[in-house]
UniProtKB/Swiss-Prot annotation:
Light-harvesting photosynthetic bile pigment-protein from the phycobiliprotein complex (phycobilisome, PBS). Phycocyanin is the major phycobiliprotein in the PBS rod. It is found in: Cellular thylakoid membrane. Heterodimer of an alpha and a beta subunit. Heterodimers further assemble into trimers and the trimers into hexamers. NCBIfam families: phycocy_alpha (TIGR01338). One of its GO terms (biological process) is photosynthesis. This is C-phycocyanin alpha subunit. It comes from Mastigocladus laminosus (Fischerella sp.). Contains one covalently linked phycocyanobilin chromophore. The keyword Glycoprotein does not apply. (2R,3E)-phycocyanobilin binds at C85.
Length: 163
């Protein structure tokens, strides 16, 4: 089961054989109050995913032109390489939407961040490429208000993990 603040609170109370405390109930209530904004953000990111992925890939190519000038399986010098880059950016974005729906970093921790350094090292992928892609997505997702805050929280979480 994916960990979220709600499942963490329940697990802690259950381990101790007690009911949820007022503090834990307030935290759960806060999550429910933010849930609508999180779902709005997840819907918008999903609806605009292809535009965001394409734009993020272009931002990477502009900032790091060698990614399109270097031959090899880990670069975007050809259509196959560009496809892999877009796929990887899409994976990051998809897991961010999962975290928005779950209401916690559990999906990011379990499906993205765990093993990230090993994957990047094994395939010679630069974290700076994905940081640039995520910065593009953050600046261009078109969200505002609480929905933007919710999305940006998870985008920043991944950027920090990559830094």
């Amino acid at each position: 089961m994916v960990k979220t603040p709600i499942t963490d609170a329940i697990a802690a109370a259950d381990t101790q054989g007690r009911f949820l405390s007022n503090t834990e109930l307030q935290a759960v209530n806060g999550r429910y109050q933010r849930a609508a904004a999180s779902l709005e953000a997840a819907r918008a990111l999903t609806a605009n995913a292809q535009r965001l992925i394409d734009g993020a890939a272009q931002a990477v190519y502009q900032k790091f032109p060698y990614t399109t000038q270097t031959s090899g399986p880990n670069y975007a010098a050809d259509a196959r390489g560009k496809s892999k880059c877009a796929r990887d950016i899409g994976h990051y974005l998809r897991i961010i939407t999962y975290s928005l729906v779950a209401g916690g970093t559990g999906p990011l921790d379990e499906y993205l961040i765990a093993g990230l350094n090993e994957i990047n090292d094994a395939f010679e992928l630069s974290p700076s490429w994905y940081i640039e892609a995520l910065k593009y997505i953050k600046a261009n997702h078109g969200l505002s208000g609480q929905a933007a805050n919710e999305a940006n929280t998870y985008i920043d979480y991944v950027i920090n993990a990559l830094s």
